[in-house]
Regions:
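N-terminal hydrophobic/helix-forming segments and targeting peptides
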Residues: 1-423
């Protein structure tokens, strides 16, 4: 557990944005012999049995079976690389009351008050006119300052945050020659490119405070981006430790843009996974109706963080089903299919946990508190394959700094490994 906690903490530090996360996954996989594949060229029999492909902030990796047969299917683990944050707008510097601020908008369902009074950096990707993509990351340069109660007595009872008026981070005292491009110019300097080369950017705030273990028994981990780097890291560890597969193809995919609906070229609602599976099916010799049958023999575990019962808000949870941190990953169920789990998928998950010797817990919502959704229903409906939704339990989901248990990440990694390795 200490080694795993140290590893996921470093993974979070290395992954301030989805683009960095995809590269961090690739770097780890290459150390285990996985080879990069270019999706802009036709795939043929030269595609490596252990390979990966990156599309923007998403990555898909695979381990093909040594002996494909008429029983072969895909065993897929899906997660997502993005988290709520503030995203830099064009002309990203704005002046207010003698302060230089970052002109930003909210990305995803951020718990907005959690971003107040925290030092943040900027990270993401810059594109230049020659088509090159440059990852960039700054140190702590900004802070969204909360108003003092002496100036707003109502803040104690009813904190209201207007996204335009109250959420912009400050970066400096404004000088006489402030340009609306000051932030972009600074990012170019950090990336080592000339500002006149910059064409566009996808840049987000990220919390510079590193993860930390805490608690009376050092059993909790506080960190940014646990939703959903906790699942990405568990899937990565499971794939790193997979020696090989005999019959089924193991596929790991970490999508981007789940927090904003998944409807992009690198999101679960786009064709990324379908494109990868189509290419791998052809490489294994499954074409035409053979590919359809291959998908019919396949399954998917959608791994996305869920909720532990909250000690201060117990009434918001189901009165009977009360999952806790460090008691095993969650099997997520919803009658409206906001989670994709059904009886068949639930059995797949329970069998993997049993094989791994891992405890698992059920999660359902209070009937009066509708739940969110995941990539699970999107994947199931796009591909027509059995899909089950799981994930570790968190408190403070969508906060700038969430918390989980140090036991649950290793549990999830072991269960995912068993799902791939089970004969």
């Amino acid at each position: 557990v200490p080694d795993y906690t140290q590893a996921i903490s470093q993974f979070v530090v290395d992954s301030p944005t989805s683009y960095h996360a995809a590269q961090a996954v690739a770097a780890r996989l290459e150390k285990r012999g996985f080879k990069a594949v270019d999706e802009t060229v036709a795939w043929d029999s030269s595609i490596p049995a252990r390979g990966y492909v990156i599309r923007d902030g998403a990555i898909a990796a695979w381990c093909l079976p040594s002996a494909p047969s008429e029983r072969t299917g895909f065993r897929i683990v899906g997660a997502h690389t993005d988290s709520p944050a503030l995203k830099l707008k064009p002309q990203g510097a704005i002046v207010r009351e003698g302060w230089e601020m970052i002109n930003a908008e909210i990305y995803g369902g951020a718990l907005e008050n959690s971003w107040l009074d925290r030092e943040v950096g900027l990270a993401g990707r810059l594109t230049t006119y020659d088509g090159a993509v440059h990852l960039v990351r700054t140190g702590p340069i900004a802070r969204t300052a909360q108003v003092a109660p002496h100036l707003d007595r109502s803040a104690h009872e009813n904190l209201h945050l207007d996204r335009q008026a109250h959420m912009l981070p400050l970066t400096a005292l404004a000088g006489e020659a402030v340009s609306c491009h000051d932030i972009e110019n600074y990012l170019c300097e950090q990336a080592g490119i000339s500002p006149d080369q910059l064409a566009f950017h996808d840049v987000f705030t990220y919390l510079v405070q590193p993860p930390s273990v805490f608690g009376l028994h050092q059993e909790f981990l506080a960190s940014s981006r646990l939703d959903n780097l906790s699942s990405v890291h568990a899937g990565l560890v499971a794939l790193e430790n997979l020696a090989g597969t005999e019959n089924d193809a193991a596929v790991f995919v970490a999508f981007d843009h789940e927090e904003v609906g998944s409807g992009t070229r690198s999101g679960a609602g786009g064709p990324f996974l379908q494109d990868v599976l189509h290419g791998l099916a052809a490489v294994m010799g499954f074409v035409g109706d053979g590919e359809r049958a291959l998908l019919a023999r396949s399954s998917c575990i959608s791994a996305d963080a869920g909720h532990s019962v909250h000690p201060n808000y117990g009434q918001l949870h189901d009165p009977q089903v009360r999952p806790l941190i460090n008691h095993g990953p969650l099997l997520k169920i919803n009658a409206r299919q906001r989670y994709a789990t059904d009886a068949v998928g639930g059995a797949i998950w329970k069998r993997a946990c049993k094989a791994a010797g891992v405890p698992t817990q059920d999660f359902v919502s209070n009937n009066s508190v509708p739940c969110g959704t995941t990539i699970g229903p999107i994947t199931a409906s796009r591909l027509g394959i059995t899909t089950v939704d799981v994930g570790i339990a968190l408190l403070s989901m969508h906060s700038a700094r969430e918390m989980c248990g140090v036991e649950d990440g290793p549990y999830l990694a072991r269960a995912l490994h068993a799902y791939w390795a089970e004969n």
